[in-house]
Amino acid sequence: MKKPCGTPASHPFLLSWVQAQAAVLGLAALAAAAAAGAMESVPKSFEIKQVTRQEAPKIDGRLDDASWQKAAVIDDFKQLQQIEHADITEKMVVYVMHDEDMLYVGARLYDSSPDLITANILRQGERMNNEDKFAVILDTFNDKRNGYRFEVNPNGIRDDALYLDTTQLQWDWEGLYYAKASRDGEGWTAEMAIPFKTLSFDPAGTTWGINFQRLIARKNERDGWVYRNRNQNPSSSGEVTGFTGMEQGLGLDVVPSVSFRQNKDHVNDTDEFKVEPSLDVYYKVTPGLNASLTFNTDFSATEVDNRQVNLSRFSLFFPEKRGLFLRESDIFEFGRLKGGDNTGNISSTFSRSTLENGRPFFSRRIGLSGSGDPVDLVAGAKVSGRIGGFNVGALAIRQDEQLTVDARNLFVARAVANVLSQSSLGLIATSGDPRSNLDNTVVGADFKYTNNTFAGGRMLEGEAWVQKSDTEGLTGDDAAWGFRMRSPNNTGWYGGLGLKHLEENFNPALGYVNRRGVNDQTLELGYTKRRPGRAVQALRSGIDIQQFNGIDSGDLESRTITWRALEAFSPLSDQLKLFYIKSTEVLEQPFQISNGIFVPVDRYDWDEVQLQLEGSASRKLSGGVTLSTGDFYTGDRWKAGGDFVWKMSPHFWLTGAYEYNGVKLPEGDFIVRLMSTRFDVMFNATWSWVTLIQYDNVSNSIAAHSRVRWIPEAGREMFIVFNHNLAEELPNGGFRSQRADATVKFNYTFRF
């Protein structure tokens, strides 16, 4: 095995800028051509009915209030999955009305076999991908770009999300709304009350985008009102007209909270008790523009990260989970450099860390040290929302001092102009480095193109972006740019092509970057065959290619070719996947892959076969298995993993996961194990208790996280949180306590 050689080449920032602008112009030209040939879907609309506050229904899930007789009625639904455009198998009727304060949505969801309704989830905010559920999609500005999604299941459990654009959802957003449901011999009914104070909208606008969806889990059937290419999102919605007289009050939410925390450090034998008050204030400057202030911000009740195994040379990505940064987070997204949830289109096999690489702003950099320990936030302010045809956002944070880093002022600003029918052109700027005392700024521009009516209803999306950082002590080679075009359709052909150029000194101190000095090139191509009514409902095959070349040398550094040989899906979404993966890594310096084991400098090519089996999560007992074997650097690797979820009842779930990597190299053999167990106890729809225990043999440590949550109603919460960390230090292989903490936290939303 020999290292490839190459000829050095220079790529100054001017050339980067010209190349990026050429990509922008190319995307714009393609956008114009696609828009000219696009087919519009058949529009649907209805006029909303208004009632008075005195007539407002009681939200109990029963649909028995007289005011529902005055509501607009929608009953013309079709399947978007299993069989697109087919008649729905179970009748569905939706009722919509509003008063001065709330939008009310009711649904009568008939079911010929009510005993078979899938309703296993009894914890607020839990994802309901495999539950019977009813969902409402709102595009309050009717601009076909962004929106809200509100869901409820037959147990009255709520879940909600923001549409960052028409292809990506932010499920960690939490909006304040009310929902209840009830079951009877004809199926189930649901009621929602969505406060206008929760939504951003134009008070002069009388027309919103709206859509409805139902999932019948046991049939894997999705029914909807308006849809395109088997999908529903703000760009493929109907319209509701006649909004008048909505009131948002003062538009002021005041959320005081207090936490009582006991910390025990067993290593240093210290004990500390803290009382931490905090305050969050949210104010609607206009119905479309929100301002917020935070003082002595407290993240003590945030869920812990799931541990991950890393056998690569580059850092992993952990998503944001803190509510302060999730509210209106869509405003700050840049260039679709986000590898999270999408709306059901084809996902590539590229790792999330490479998809996120190059983000100018990643809020997880704030309030956390490089080792992941919390850093206090003294105060913060944010303005975000929509002004005319612009989306704007600004965030300022005062972060407290930590070890050798002084207290820091951190700032990010974002402005996005809506262009074409579904596209946007934006700017971003950041200032400050939360993890050093060096000055740092980043400026960038991006163009995002979206067309979901391309070629008769196909999806076409693209983006082009450019950034430049300025870091104290670094000069030159500090730019980044990229572009990508994708047609992520879930039926027929799909494909994509992209390039990221990340120079050696590009340093977004408030962003995320785990690999620099490279050109990251991606290609994806495949085909999905739908077979309605068959035991194997869909078949897919394709190829994903990702290659990294050094910018200066042009030499190959890494390449992964994944042949998606076979992907088969049952009507209930059971999945079988067979992949053949060919990898190349070029090491220019020894790589410590495990404690005391170094892979020497050389070029390495290896092959791997991977089999994945996954059972439908709609069953009470579900899970998956992943098996792979093949070469690995100078030796070979056997990898096995599995997970299961046992929903014994809506009140008790047991979850387990195990991952094993057995690596044999001439330089040394090693095994990496990662295990986790989770217990979910749902006493009812307001009380839950979740315990997560994780272990890995790299850190040789166990972490236990237990959280009791009480939500008597939306906007009121109590948490009781226990954390305990143990390390394998005793001579007999036993574990010794490292640290433990207990927290009780209360918060209450006062809405004016």
Residue locations for each model-derived region?
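N-terminal secretory signal peptides that target proteins for export/translocation
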Residues: 1-17
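Bacterial N-terminal signal peptides
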Residues: 17-33
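A cross-taxa feature marking solvent-exposed loop/turn segments within ectodomains of secreted
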Residues: 41, 129, 143-145, 203, ...
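Membrane-spanning beta-strand positions in outer-membrane beta-barrel proteins
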Residues: 104, 189, 201, 253, ...
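Catalytic-domain carbohydrate-binding cleft regions of carbohydrate-active enzymes
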Residues: 270, 280, 290, 299-306, ...
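Exposed, low-structure sequence patches enriched in small/polar residues
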Residues: 376, 453, 457-459, 464-752
